Amino acid sequence: IVSVVGGMPVIIPALGEQIDQQYLLQHIDGLVFPGSPSNVEPHHYRGPASDAGTLHDAARDSTTLPLIKAAIALGIPVLGICRGFQEMNVAFGGALHQKVHEVDGYMDHREPEDTPVGQQYGLRHALHVQPGGLLAGIGLPDEIQVNSIHGQGVQRLAPGLRVEALAPDGLIE
């Protein structure tokens, strides 16, 4: 998508403090933080330790969390998708459910392992766009269908962030 509109995508390696963030941020117009099979480590949001075997990526956390805050402070647009969205919340002081599917009242947002990959990443549920937000402001309808594959989810929204859309179970997406 970036190339289609005349931009040049740049992959930022997960090198933490080895990256000169100020230099990097002076040379980009926006950041996209994509999904990943790994989860944000719970110590970043004062959560309980994860179950043994939970996949984390400390190098990514040490790169993305400070980079998100620095980009926003400079007015650089940031888009978080899947894990990237969870990172945005944590970077600003929010907390996550580690396993949304184990929280009463929430549906299972993980990929159904017993279905083909093409269906796993297909449209999964409705998303209710909230009035007054950016998504509503660009003309999205009140309800859209989305794919939704994640184990973690927003437990407490970070100060300064606002809800743009909700899953049918009320989970912020």
Where are these regions (language model features)?
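Conserved G/P- and acidic residue-centered "switch" motifs that form tight phosphate/ATP-binding loops
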Residues: 82
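The feature captures the ABC ATPase H-loop/switch
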Residues: 85
